[in-house]
């Protein structure tokens, strides 16, 4: 009977302690549309796509690429239950997901039975795994999504027995271990499914998509899992507020959004509603995040455990959905430009229509993501030679964070001058534990920021949360200031300002106060450029791919530029096994002072007008 079941569900869900702003109905399947397909797309969506292929050359080219991917998948070895690093099945889950999505879309576009036949062999192999590695629940969630798409997009091709078998794999390998975690919040899976970071969105979305796929055949199991998924995903979605920024950085923002967009679109196509999840404050601004974090050279501001060229600066297929969902034409066209280079099934499914670029409102040159303490400044849009700065303050306690408060990246004249090294190997000993701050790339010294009084301990406070105090376009320059004081407990005050002039020159200004104590400060900038330092040490020339950048040390006058290898300081820990930072050197300023110090470095592109030697206090910016 349904009513006793619903009563038990309400009791079970009540154990969740995370606040929930949206009330989930007792029977979320009340409006279920039983027709397949309904996971991310319905029959009308696929029909529209077929029509689009007749008139949109880019879409047609992408479709050919996806069909080639599907054909190649038919000849690849079947998936095996292997944990390559001893911990994760994730690479296997992702391979299954990508293959099934390509095969499913190829079936929808061609009707060729070879695609579901090949998909069945893959599903059968992965379905017969002993498990989908629930201790690392991302693996389970991604595989559940793959099976949801397989069941749904190729539903017409399956026999009744095949449909039931896929349902059973989804239930036993995906929903059952999820329910154990949902009903036991203190368990490992319980924590993973309730995570307030990317894990929460990926895990709950994958399970939610699995539940929606089987809902017509197994409504009781689907209803129970779906209610929990809808409830548990909300705390992580709340972290997009107020302006769409994501504290874990671009890469994990993209990972979370890939799954959230899949889930929300599946809710809409399956039930006609996402229960208001897409209206959670800040979420509608999320398409802005990758748009603004990408510099003119095509690199992303890769703070935290992210890379500057994450996913090969590839298509962001979910961005097409989000941009159209939230009517963000700039983001939509940004995705369309990328999608052709790295075509995939979802990128084609959600490919935004071509638009007249002249009808797209110009974006702001300056953008602040206030909650995460991140700002981007640029001189103009649509110019690969434009000046660009990514700058962050932020919270060192955030999942995947580095000790990178105060760090920045810098592009101008088509070159990426100040770079972020990104993450190290996740399988290094205790990478996410007590040894995390021993690894160079994760320490302040491995980022483009300050180190105060260096030693073996973490070189910023691991609990610091620092705000941006200014972010504005002044007309002649973009400005951002961060109060970094909480990151440096050995100082009484530390503030950093970024001044990006319209000619692309950048001033980095640091105002420090040691409270009367002797202090040593290192100023670091990692660069792939060749560094030549002047005889007096007051200036340096950076050379890269035929372009030149001049660095001038305006203050203090008694300091000098140096260059160092991108390796730990002699006083720092240096565990074995870390990545070698090949081709990267550090431009360095060292200052020993007592009381107050102001460090000002000007970076000027070749032919650019040098900034005035006078220094304006940050308080007067």
Set out the residue ranges of the language-model regions.
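Sec-dependent signal peptide recognition
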Residues: 1-8
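Solvent-exposed loop and edge beta-strand segments that line ligand/cofactor-binding
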Residues: 38, 78-96, 128-141, 179-202, ...
């Amino acid at each position: 009977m349904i009513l006793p079941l619903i009563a038990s569900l309400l009791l079970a869900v009540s154990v969740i302690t995370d606040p929930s702003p949206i009330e989930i109905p007792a029977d979320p399947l009340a409006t279920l549309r039983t027709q397949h397909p309904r996971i991310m797309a319905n029959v009308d969506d696929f029909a529209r796509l077929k029509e689009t292929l007749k008139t949109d050359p880019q879409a047609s080219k992408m479709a050919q690429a996806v069909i080639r991917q599907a054909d190649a998948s038919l000849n690849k070895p079947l998936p095996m239950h292997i944990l390559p690093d001893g911990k994760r099945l994730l690479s296997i889950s992702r391979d299954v997901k990508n293959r099934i999505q390509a095969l499913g879309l190829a079936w929808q576009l061609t009707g060729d039975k070879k695609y579901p036949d090949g998909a069945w062999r893959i599903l059968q192999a992965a379905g017969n795994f002993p498990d989908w590695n629930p201790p690392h629940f991302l693996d389970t969630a991604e595989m559940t999504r793959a099976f949801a798409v397989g069941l749904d997009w190729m539903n017409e091709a399956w026999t009744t027995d095949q449909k039931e078998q896929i349902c059973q794999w989804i239930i036993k390998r995906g929903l059952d271990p999820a329910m154990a975690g949902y009903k036991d919040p203190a368990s490992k899976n319980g924590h993973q499914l309730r995570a307030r970071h990317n894990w929460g969105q990926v895990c709950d979305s994958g399970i939610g998509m699995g539940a929606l796929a089987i809902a017509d055949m197994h409504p009781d199991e689907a209803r129970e899992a779906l209610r929990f998924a809808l409830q548990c995903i909300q705390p992580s979605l709340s972290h997009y507020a107020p302006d769409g920024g994501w504290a874990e950085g671009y890469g994990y923002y993209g990972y979370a959004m890939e799954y959230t967009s899949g889930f929300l679109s599946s809710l809409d196509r399956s039930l006609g509603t996402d229960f208001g999840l897409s209206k959670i404050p800040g979420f509608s601004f999320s398409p802005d995040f990758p748009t603004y974090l990408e510099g003119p050279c095509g690199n992303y501001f890769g703070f935290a455990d992210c890379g500057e060229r994450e996913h090969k600066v590839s298509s962001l297929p979910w961005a097409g959905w989000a941009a159209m969902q939230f009517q963000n034409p700039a983001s939509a066209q940004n995705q369309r430009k990328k999608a052709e280079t790295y075509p995939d099934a979802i990128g084609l499914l959600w490919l935004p229509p071509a638009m007249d670029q002249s009808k797209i409102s110009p974006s702001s040159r300056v953008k602040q993501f206030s909650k995460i303490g991140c700002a981007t400044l640029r001189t103009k849009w649509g110019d690969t030679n434009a000046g660009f700065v990514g700058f962050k303050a932020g919270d060192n306690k955030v999942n995947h964070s580095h000790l990178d408060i105060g760090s920045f990246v810098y592009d101008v004249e088509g070159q990426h001058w100040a770079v972020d090294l990104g993450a190290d190997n996740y399988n290094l000993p205790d990478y996410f534990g007590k040894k995390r701050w021993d690894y160079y790339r994760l320490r302040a010294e491995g980022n483009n920021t300050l180190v105060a009084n260096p030693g073996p301990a973490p070189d910023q406070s691991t609990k610091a949360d620092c705000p941006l105090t200014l972010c504005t376009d002044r007309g002649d320059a973009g400005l951002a200031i961060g109060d970094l004081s909480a990151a440096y407990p050995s100082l009484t005050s530390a503030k950093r300002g970024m001044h990006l002039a319209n000619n692309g020159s950048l001033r980095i200004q640091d105002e420090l106060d040691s409270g009367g104590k002797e202090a040593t400060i290192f100023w670091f900038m990692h660069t792939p450029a060749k560094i030549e330092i002047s005889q007096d040490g007051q200036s340096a020339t950076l050379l890269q791919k035929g372009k030149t950048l001049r660095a001038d040390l305006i203050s203090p006058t008694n300091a000098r530029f140096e260059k160092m290898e991108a390796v730990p300081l002699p006083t720092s820990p240096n565990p074995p096994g870390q990545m070698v930072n090949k081709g990267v050197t550090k431009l360095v300023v060292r200052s020993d002072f007592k009381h107050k110090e102001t460090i000002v470095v000007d970076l000027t592109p070749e032919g650019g007008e040098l900034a005035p030697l006078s220094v304006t206090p940050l308080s007067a910016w």
